[in-house]
């Protein structure tokens, strides 16, 4: 939380100061003996220990990164009440020490409580103000729908505030009719009275916006004054707290604690709750509810079959056919499993085709040449290389006497050999394609698994958003916009001379600056990676500290935020 480090350091400073003063006192044995015999002093010491335990718990919560720590007011109030009527021993050496310790701890804890409540409630006022500003900028249809949403609430408020007998007079004050002409409307034509609902909605929005502006102005100024005065007035912090709580000067610590416990900021014009926003939808659903429920019940078997087929079986087949099988194929490819090779033609087809061609050519050449002149080994190598010179010479000779060779069958045999040669060439081409496919088999396996990986990535991303943001829909754009707006407002407020204004202007700027830094810290922590959240909070806390850095130093921190964390926004 913003300024929590200041609270923790102040509480630790009080503890060190108290321990040092105890050490500097007279003999500890005498002190303990006197404490045991003086009932009021012993009771005060118990109250001090109770408040100190509360302070230590608060420091531990701050150091542990807890957003807000809830103070146990009942224990503090019961302890203060027990001391309210007690008489202290005259000349007790521990009397001022215990009194000061209780007051110091108590004032800082109360300051932390008010700080926590303001940082929790005032941003909600800003959100309410932004909500009504957004509604005012919507189209006339959306403004009419907003009017429909709040109509039941408005009617209830109206009838609670006015008796039924006063209703006609109130309506006449709202809309006066003279000689069948509407008076008081922004237009001069009577038929444009249809714009009255829009005018009423706009008036309601303007009134709520004005009320929120006034409430924000008062509370932000008081918050800024508390932030400014409490660290300065170390000797009169109780009066600073009393002034913030609008208590009388000189109020007791018991009264201040009670006032802090009850203090709260409720929006004078909160956003409509979900019942107000969705009652038209709920009403429509209830109107068609019985028929819809009956239709669903009658079609329950079809719905169950649809869910089974399109959800469960889809998930099973997706994992089996698009994840497990491609992974198995990729594993087989990496291990050079011959049974998993991709091929267009069956294995051994090319060798069979070539061997058949070799036998056909050798037999053909032996029949047309002297058998002893044919070197079979050389001829087989030539055929493997595609060299058919001897066969083509015989074929060319046959073409000189085609009819005779056709009758004898030699020409037909030559043509069949050439057909076989074409088959071999085709098999060689297909074999080359097979080699290419086998070389890219790993790529094909990865491509085949890509759809399943994409679906798994979307599911994992949705689950991460559900855990981190509480919804499967992305809020990154919303958080980035909020961070951008807060950074702009912080830099604008830092450029204004806050230190030069000690009145309402300075208090307003300081309070608004602290609220913007709190929003910046909260929304930025959702965008920054978890490993860098501590750095982000440290930088924002440095910028929020009123004494750690000057205005120039804080502006330099803004520049560092842009440079270091800009890629996340």
Curated annotation (Swiss-Prot):
It comes from the Eukaryota. Keywords: Membrane, Mitochondrion, Transmembrane, Transmembrane helix. It is found in: Mitochondrion membrane. Pfam families: NCA2. One of its GO terms (biological process) is aerobic respiration. The keyword Membrane applies. The chain crosses the membrane at residues 279-299, 442-462. Its main location: mitochondrion. InterPro entries: NCA2 (IPR013946). It is a multi-pass membrane protein. One of its GO terms (cellular component) is mitochondrial outer membrane. The keyword rRNA-binding does not apply. Involved in the mitochondrial expression of subunits 6 and 8 of the F0-F1 ATP synthase. This is Nuclear control of ATPase protein 2.
């Amino acid at each position: 939380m913003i300024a929590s480090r200041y609270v923790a350091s102040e509480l630790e400073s009080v503890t060190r100061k108290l321990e040092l003063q105890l050490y500097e006192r007279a003999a500890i044995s005498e002190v303990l003996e006197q404490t045991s015999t003086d009932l009021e002093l012993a009771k005060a010491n118990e109250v001090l220990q109770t408040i100190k335990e509360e302070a230590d718990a608060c420091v531990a919560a701050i150091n542990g990164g807890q957003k807000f720590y809830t103070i146990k007011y009942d224990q503090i109030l019961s302890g203060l009440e027990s001391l309210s009527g007690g008489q202290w021993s005259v000349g007790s050496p521990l009397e001022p020490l215990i009194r000061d310790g209780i007051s110091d701890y108590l004032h800082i804890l109360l300051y932390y409580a008010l700080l926590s409540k303001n940082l929790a409630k005032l941003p909600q006022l800003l959100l309410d103000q932004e909500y009504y500003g957004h509604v005012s900028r919507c189209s006339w249809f959306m403004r009419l729908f907003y009017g429909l949403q709040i109509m039941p609430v408005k009617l209830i408020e109206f009838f609670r505030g006015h008796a039924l007998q006063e209703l006609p007079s109130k309506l006449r004050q709202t809309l006066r009719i003279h000689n069948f002409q509407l008076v008081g409307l922004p237009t001069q034509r009577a038929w444009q009275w249809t714009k009255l609902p829009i005018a009423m909605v706009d008036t309601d929005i303007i009134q709520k916006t004005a009320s929120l502006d006034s409430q924000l102005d008062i509370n932000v100024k008081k918050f800024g004054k508390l932030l400014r005065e409490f660290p300065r007035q170390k000797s009169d912090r109780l009066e600073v707290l009393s002034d913030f709580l609008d208590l009388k000067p000189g109020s007791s610590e018991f009264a201040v604690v009670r006032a802090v416990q009850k203090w709260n900021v409720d929006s004078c014009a909160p956003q409509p709750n979900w019942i107000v926003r969705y009652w038209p939808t709920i009403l429509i659903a209830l109107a068609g509810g019985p028929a819809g429920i009956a239709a669903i019940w009658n079609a329950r078997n079809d719905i169950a079959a649809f869910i089974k087929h399109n959800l469960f079986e889809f998930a099973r087949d997706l994992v089996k056919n698009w994840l497990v099988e491609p992974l198995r194929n990729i594993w087989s490819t990496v291990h050079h499993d011959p049974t998993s090779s991709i091929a267009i033609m069956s294995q051994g087809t090319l060798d069979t085709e070539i061997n058949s061609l070799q036998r056909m050519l050798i037999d053909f050449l032996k029949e047309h040449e002297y058998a002893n002149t044919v070197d079979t080994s050389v001829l087989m190598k030539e055929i493997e290389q595609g060299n058919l010179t001897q066969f083509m010479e015989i074929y060319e000779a046959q073409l000189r006497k085609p009819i005779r060779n056709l009758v004898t069958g030699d020409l037909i045999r030559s043509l069949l050999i050439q057909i076989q040669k074409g088959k071999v060439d085709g098999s060689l081409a297909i074999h080359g394609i097979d080699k290419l496919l086998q070389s890219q088999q790993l790529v094909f396996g990865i491509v085949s698994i890509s759809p399943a990986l994409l679906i798994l990535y979307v599911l994992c991303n949705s689950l991460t958003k559900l855990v981190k943001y509480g919804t499967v829909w992305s809020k990154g754009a919303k958080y980035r916009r909020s961070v951008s707006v807060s950074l702009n407002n912080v830099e604008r407020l830092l450029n204004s001379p806050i230190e030069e204004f000690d009145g309402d202007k300075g208090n307003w700027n300081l309070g608004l600056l602290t609220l913007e830094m709190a929003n910046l810290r909260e929304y930025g922590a959702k965008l920054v990676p978890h490993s860098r959240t501590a750095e982000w909070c440290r930088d924002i806390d440095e910028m929020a500290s009123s004494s750690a850095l000057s205005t120039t130093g804080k502006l330099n921190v803004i520049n560092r935020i842009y440079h270091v964390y800009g890629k996340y926004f």
